[in-house]
Curated annotation (Swiss-Prot):
The lineage of its organism: Bacteria, Pseudomonadati, Thermodesulfobacteriota, Desulfuromonadia, Geobacterales. Pathway: Amino-acid biosynthesis; L-methionine biosynthesis via salvage pathway; L-methionine from S-methyl-5-thio-alpha-D-ribose 1-phosphate: step 1/6. PANTHER family: METHYLTHIORIBOSE-1-PHOSPHATE ISOMERASE. Its EC number is 5.3.1.23. It catalyses: 5-(methylsulfanyl)-alpha-D-ribose 1-phosphate = 5-(methylsulfanyl)-D-ribulose 1-phosphate. This is Methylthioribose-1-phosphate isomerase. The record marks C157 as: Transition state stabilizer. The active site is at D237 (proton donor). Catalyzes the interconversion of methylthioribose-1-phosphate (MTR-1-P) into methylthioribulose-1-phosphate (MTRu-1-P). It comes from Citrifermentans bemidjiense (strain ATCC BAA-1014 / DSM 16622 / JCM 12645 / Bem). Gene3D superfamilies: translation initiation factor eif-2b, domain 1, Translation initiation factor eif-2b, domain 2. InterPro entries: IF-2B-related, IF-M1Pi, IF_2B-like_C, Initiation_fac_2B_a/b/d, M1Pi_N, NagB/RpiA_transferase-like. It holds the Pfam family IF-2B. GO terms for biological process: L-methionine salvage from methylthioadenosine.
Amino acid sequence: MSFRTIEWRDNKVIMIDQTRLPAEEVYNEYTDFQGVAQAIRGMVVRGAPAIGIAAAMGVALGAREIIADSFDTFYRQLENVCEVIGRTRPTAVNLFWGLERMKRVALQHKELNLNSIRELLKAEAISIETEDLAICKEIGRHGAALVKEGASILTHCNAGGLATAGYGTALGVIRGAHEAGKGIRVFADETRPWLQGARLTAWELMKDSIPVTLISDNMAGWLMKTGQIDFCVVGADRIAANGDTANKIGTYSVAVLAKENRIPFYVAAPISTLDLKLANGDLIPIEERASEEVTQIKGIQIAPEGVKVRNPAFDVTPARYITGIITEKGVVRGDYERELKALVGQ
């Protein structure tokens, strides 16, 4: 891939600014955890796995900012750093997974001096990024096996290299099928209101010379009905124990339409996106974002001033609409509650 979503370089976090794509390919530098938190909140970086990496790197930066003379003081301040970052995006469970992993590293090495702990936290954050790339390629390998030769694939939002350390989850499946020479083509929903499909997915696939056609969100059902879609694959921000899946708003509609038209609908996500503490999707917190994201496009007002707006960033697709969940350890189908627990060794 010709871009890097996020990386640690010279004690700085470097992120591609996804709010400026596709017009400009700009990389921002962050030297403190507050900047990283603002980048997560402001959608400079987005996508559950990428948010988890950013959160971990933000903690590593925060650890370098802490002035303390004991581990207890250091750890209390580290928890404050995690709390600030944790308030940015409540739905993506990878965010909290990354924070907990960083806190665990600090606690496991509390007998070391603080500079050594800071270095271990930096190393852990970098490891999370490295691991994610390998995980996405495994997801792509498992998912590509499900795709038939010449398939037309529909995807929603962006679950690609921009949403991960690289390669992607849903787009990892697409990349895997493309690399296997299956002659696929992709239909990308534009994905209002942030237009991740139009701005990001189309940009990524075009850079990789994967055939892609952009469609408006309300075209998907008609394309399915007229036999133009063979396979649907999306990412996930949180998956409950029963397989209910939170993903970008509009995913539920795609899943229902796919089932109505007898088209397989798959979710592609790493195991870190599972939240087996939640029995079902009704318990997943749904982020509500600013009304201006709906009433404006690039600062231009497109709706009447003062109109009431709902802007949930995510919806929850019940497990009954999901053909299978593609993870780095394989594909889970059917009895999600039992199979997801088995996948993580519970």
